[in-house]
Amino acid sequence: MRTRKMMLYVGMIASLTVGIFISGAGQQKVEAKTKVTYTLKKGTLTIKGKGAMPTKMKFRRNKKIKKVIIKKGVTSVSYEAFALCKNLNSVTIPSTVKTIGIRSFYGTKISKITVPSKTKTIGQGAFGSCKDLKTIVMPGDFKLKLEEDTDDKLWYVASDQSAVDTITFNTKLKLENVSYLSANNLVVAKNDPSYQSIEGVIYTKDGKGIVRVPQKRTELKIKEGCTEFNMQSVLYNSTDSEGDEFNNCSKLKKIVIPSSVKSINKVKYKTDRADACDMHVDTIEIAPKDFDANSLYALGSSLGKNITIESLMKLLPDQITYK
């Protein structure tokens, strides 16, 4: 009887030992799946594996890197991973990447980049100071990741220091994200449920209202057929790290309003909590002759003083100058 009990105990211990060993082996296998490695050969850096790119995996200021290929399975690009890699001119990002870290490609030589539509988070300054960067394809509904405890005052993904001409969105647009993107043209996805792009400017889906003007524009000609000038299209703000507001379209010098515009709205499509920052363009040309005094005052007080239309001079002589 004692012999049978002893054998039973030994069997139980053996089973537990095997179970622990198998469990441990399984855990090691899972850990192996999340391992991300890299190789650098003849200027091409290849990153592969399963899971997040390690935070310690940084190539900052590496002059040997000319091309980066991130393989499918990698789920993130780490903080400042390739910042100031002055010779980096080509980047491939797979659909598995969900997060692009803060200043990941800051100050590189890339001329174009495509961020997958499945990417959910993009870090502050990810494409900042990329002086050769002309085109970006990226999600419109991304979440901006900000650096904690920073003195950097500008919240952006692509800044004025970058040479970005066109940003094309491959998902529906979250309107406040426009505040973080400096470009000459903004192109929304064809299947965006709320907006469309006309000549690089964002309008409502039916084209009746203007919604956002790109930050680098110096002149705006509202398209004929638009019936509502939403002033937030040019008055929208960004917020710095200290909570101060600044106007995004400060480069705008001239606005041309066509005869199709029938109304002016100062608050529609407002995405920030603070009041809009007033700005002053050099010239506002108005074709419509039936604006009321309140609309004209809103234009003159928020956007500028030079409004070229003779028949309206008598309405608001202090705000209107005829040229």
Protein language model features and the residues they cover:
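Sec-dependent signal peptide cleavage junction
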Residues: 19-35
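Bacterial N-terminal signal peptides that target proteins for export
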Residues: 1-12
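Bacterial N-terminal signal peptides
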Residues: 11-21
